């Protein structure tokens, strides 16, 4: 009565007895002897031991290969699991195999800790498996009790997981840190736009260089097959062709008035109090100083004869996060401030990127642009970037396609919010590219308003706490 795949039993059962079950057809394909006490579609062709008379119209003798060709290739029609478009049998089989692998890979139950309600749908879809979807809790005690009872892993968002990991693992419970993947959405997470990809890191997090992460371990230790690297190259080319980035914030490419015949350098701004900036900060970036100011000054000093373009981070510009620079100061240190120009447009016109740890550096690498790194992002230290900081754990040289295979194929999980199914990165890329080129959804506008409201509420709470002190 257990849930067991028939294919796991065929090696143990050389002979199958059935009335008309589909099990008998699959047993034939597996090479088993099949006795039928009914007359299913696969009986009467000389392949089965038939205990009832066959219809006169089944007069021909067929091979198992001919039977499979008739059933799978000529009789059935197939549709893409995510886009509902006609596909051939081989493609349908590959897609079903992917969905099966994704489902079975989640054999361990999961107890979710303090995961926001709007994120739970994506997390559930990516972690659903034989043990069922995650069970979400608000308190740590309830989470740990559930984990002990069901022998579950604990999943928590970002630095919540990093901070609690020692306590959780001290009890013999596995802990996963969740964060957005690198092909995320059309719009910001702060605007409650659902993610197309998430990472579930069992060691650290990709933006925390103080400890290993799963993606760092993949790059430091794993090997990649030729097929994986070919797939990575294809994925990279498609990303560049579709001009897809992490958030894909669209807008009109405002003319920047760049001097003709002069090379340009992009300096992407970051959120100054983001964990990606605060943890593992090199001594050359003193704590308490605006990372964007230091970075911009260095870029200008390193490229005095080039046009330095500063792109403020959208969360800083739109949602008031930390890291803003005084306008007069900006005018002195940046040749151009590209506030409303989409990052994908900038990556098509610059010849160099100077970054602290922005994902724009990774996106520039995908496009073949030289990148100088002043912090310790996951893509630094592998021989692909000019690194200002030491990366002692990352001594292995990697190719760009190996980096893509690790960061975009092996490390994240992907989810298609339209079908509700787990999906490979190619499907997520197509969804993002199509959404990026289509009209903005009304929910996106509502999300931006709600996102700004959340930021304002946080500010008010911080102010109130300061007054109470």
Range-by-range predicted roles:
Residues 1-469:
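Catalytic-core helical/loop segments in enzymes performing group transfer/polymerization on anionic/lipid-linked
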